[in-house]
Regions:
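The feature captures the conserved acid-bearing segment of alpha/beta-hydrolase catalytic domains
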Residues: 22-95
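Short, electropositive, low-hydrophobicity segments enriched in small/polar residues
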Residues: 7, 64, 166
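Intrinsically disordered, low-complexity boundary segments flanking structured domains
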Residues: 12-13, 70-74, 170-174
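Conserved alpha/beta-hydrolase "nucleophile elbow" surrounding the catalytic nucleophile
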Residues: 3-5
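Residue-level detector of alpha-helical segments with a strong bias toward transmembrane helices
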Residues: 17, 70, 98-102
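Short glycine-enriched nucleophile-adjacent loop
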Residues: 8-18
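Stable alpha-helical elements in mature extracytoplasmic
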Residues: 7-10, 70, 148, 152
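Alpha/beta-hydrolase-fold serine-hydrolase catalytic core, especially in secreted/extracellular enzymes
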Residues: 80, 89, 97-189
Length: 189
């Protein structure tokens, strides 16, 4: 099972009630605690799953909507086995189709949508949007696309098909393998 953002949260939450899921691929999921802010999505995740489920998270280091600190929280709470791959110089929309257009249009849309909002809402939105770089300053969307397809397929093949080559690949030096393809990642430990 896989999902992005709120879909990533629903992926994690589904495991509490559904024993059919045998591997997950949350992409920049919601639900990670960020500092002192009370977050109902975070508190709703118990990680008391029906069974042990291998997790491969793919997240971005510059996520302006769901910051990396929340991903660290999810990593700490998620039971083993788990891998968290961080795509460097990427933002939240790197896990969508048409990354560049989504990245740039979201910022413009939210600025317009909150133009008449109350001051607290504007302040909160401005703080988030101030972290959002234009797509021209981030890695190309193809890096995320190739990372998700390559690692995601390996993760599902290793865990759903018992493919030993895929499992061996996931245990290899992923940073070097991706670097050879021009994709910079780090691994959360």
């Amino acid at each position: 099972m896989s999902g992005h953002s709120f879909g990533g949260w629903t992926t994690l939450k589904t495991l509490e009630n559904d024993d059919r899921i045998r591997a997950i691929l949350p992409l920049a999921p919601a639900g990670g605690a960020n500092g002192d802010d009370e977050d109902p999505l975070s508190s709703a995740l118990t990680f008391d799953w029906c069974q042990k489920v291998p997790a491969l998270y793919i997240v971005s280091d510059l996520d302006s909507i769901l910051p990396l600190s929340g991903m660290h929280d999810l990593h700490q709470r998620n039971p083993e086995p788990k891998i968290v791959v961080i795509l460097e110089n990427a933002d939240h929309f790197h896990f969508n189709d048409d990354v560049e257009a989504n990245q740039d249009s979201f910022k413009q849309f939210m600025e317009a949508a909150t133009a008449d909002a109350d001051e607290d809402t504007k302040r909160g939105m401005d703080a988030m949007l101030s972290l959002m770089k234009p797509s021209s300053e981030l890695v190309p969307g193809t890096h995320a696309y190739n990372l998700i397809n390559g690692l995601g397929l390996s993760h599902f093949d290793a865990n759903l098909r018992d493919n030993k080559d895929a499992a061996t690949f996931l245990e290899s030096d992923l940073r070097s393998v991706m670097a050879a393809r021009g994709i910079t990642i780090s691994l959360m430990t």
